[in-house]
């Protein structure tokens, strides 16, 4: 945590520059940037540096990101990949993208798949399931999509695939972006509302 007033008020600046001296002062052995970036001055850190890269989708699908966002992400992600001793990629596809876009040697990148909290593995009691099913008027079986409803998540492709399958209902949970309208237009035009 930032220790002085300015760093507390300007957390982004602290994460980018202020944290490194503190890591050295506290004799930290390993620093792990969990979300695609490391401080810009991390080279001054005396310990080992690890970064987890979740995706480089802003490079693969540039049309989905404003120019300035792409420039900022690219600078942060490239800096992190260059500075890290080890890069954790959350999928083989992310690993390939890092190698392709940043020319990082394969030996520096390790694929570690993400998991989820143990709470999601617990079996719910039947009365809880029944209550949720009744509240949301859910069918006995369905395909569940969870994620922001935006173009890069590719919900429209899933909806198009439904048209070619047996009667599997789709339940969508997520925040709507303008892309939602495009998905709904397709659903209406292809009479998939009942799905």
Task: Mark where each language-model region is.
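Carbohydrate transferase catalytic cores enriched for Leloir-type hexosyltransferases
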Residues: 1-195
């Amino acid at each position: 945590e930032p220790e002085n007033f300015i760093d507390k008020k300007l957390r982004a600046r602290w994460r980018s520059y202020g944290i490194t001296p503190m890591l050295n002062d506290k004799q930290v052995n390993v620093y792990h940037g969990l979300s695609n970036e490391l401080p810009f001055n991390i080279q001054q850190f005396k310990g080992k540096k690890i970064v987890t890269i979740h995706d480089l989708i802003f490079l693969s699908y540039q049309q989905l990101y404003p120019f300035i966002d792409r420039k900022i992400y690219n600078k942060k992600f490239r800096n992190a990949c260059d500075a890290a001793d080890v890069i954790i990629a959350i999928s083989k596809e992310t690993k390939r993208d890092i190698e392709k876009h940043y020319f990082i040697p394969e030996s520096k990148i390790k694929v570690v798949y993400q998991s989820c909290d143990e709470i999601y593995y617990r079996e719910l009691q039947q009365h809880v399931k029944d209550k949720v099913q009744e509240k949301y008027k859910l069918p006995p079986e369905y395909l569940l999509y969870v994620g922001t409803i935006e173009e890069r998540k590719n919900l429209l492709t899933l909806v198009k695939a439904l048209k070619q399958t047996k009667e599997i209902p789709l339940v969508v949970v997520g925040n709507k972006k303008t892309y939602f309208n495009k998905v709904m237009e397709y659903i209406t035009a292809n009479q998939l509302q009942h799905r």
